[in-house]
Design a protein with these regions (language model features):
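Short linker/helix segments within small regulatory modules
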Residues: 18-27
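Short cysteine-rich clusters marking metal-coordination/redox-active sites
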Residues: 9-12, 29-32
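Short pre-active-site segment immediately N-terminal to redox-active cysteine/selenocysteine motifs
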Residues: 57, 64-68, 111
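Non-catalytic, surface beta->alpha helical segment in thiol-disulfide oxidoreductase systems
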Residues: 111, 116-150
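A short beta-strand-turn-helix
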Residues: 41-60
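Short Cys/His-rich micro-motifs in 6-15 aa windows
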Residues: 32-41
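Cys/His-rich microdomains that often coordinate metals
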Residues: 16, 36, 76
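Thiol-based oxidoreductase modules, predominantly thioredoxin-like and allied folds used
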Residues: 64, 75, 79-83, 87-102, ...
Length: 152
């Protein structure tokens, strides 16, 4: 892992350079001075999606969901708890496909919920269907580790 990481602020979407050893719960954005780590998933829209996927040095796990989807609503608390467990190693984010159908179309989302793991803009893996917190954590760690071994 790089000694300096790029980490996108979940509030103002400014890219911050942070020493890997300093990426803790107390790291703040250099622009808006709010915490970089939220302990929960961040909401992405069409404007913030690319910036968060392309500029993060860390993997980003995106939950493509919709408010009318029962399994999506059922999985939401598990996804939020998984975010608290996986941060700062994997950033968790959510995209409302009803509000942002262009993102669902661009990434060929055919069923929801669908989890897609990205690293520096490249899709590493995807899973369709609701998962428990432990399954989300296990799956994302396994896919992230598999991708890092393939890259080395």
């Amino acid at each position: 892992m790089a000694s300096t990481l790029h980490f996108v602020c979940p509030h103002c979407h400014t890219t911050n350079r942070i020493a890997a050893e300093n990426l803790t719960g107390s790291a703040d954005c250099g622009q808006c001075h709010r915490p970089l780590l939220t302990g929960g998933p961040i909401e992405l829209d069409a404007n913030s999606f690319e910036r968060n996927l392309m500029r993060h040095h860390l993997p980003v796990l995106v939950d493509f969901w919709a408010p009318w989807c029962g399994p999506c609503r059922q999985m939401a608390p598990a996804f939020a708890r998984a975010a608290a467990e996986l941060e700062p190693h994997i950033r968790l984010a959510k995209v409302d496909t009803q509000s942002h159908p262009e993102l669902a179309s661009r990434y060929a989302i055919r069923a929801i919920p669908t989890l897609v793991l990205f690293h520096q803009g490249r899709e590493l893996a995807r899973h369709s269907g609701a998962m428990s917190q432990s399954d989300i954590v296990r799956w994302s760690q396994m896919q992230s580790t598999r991708a890092s071994h393939a890259a080395s």
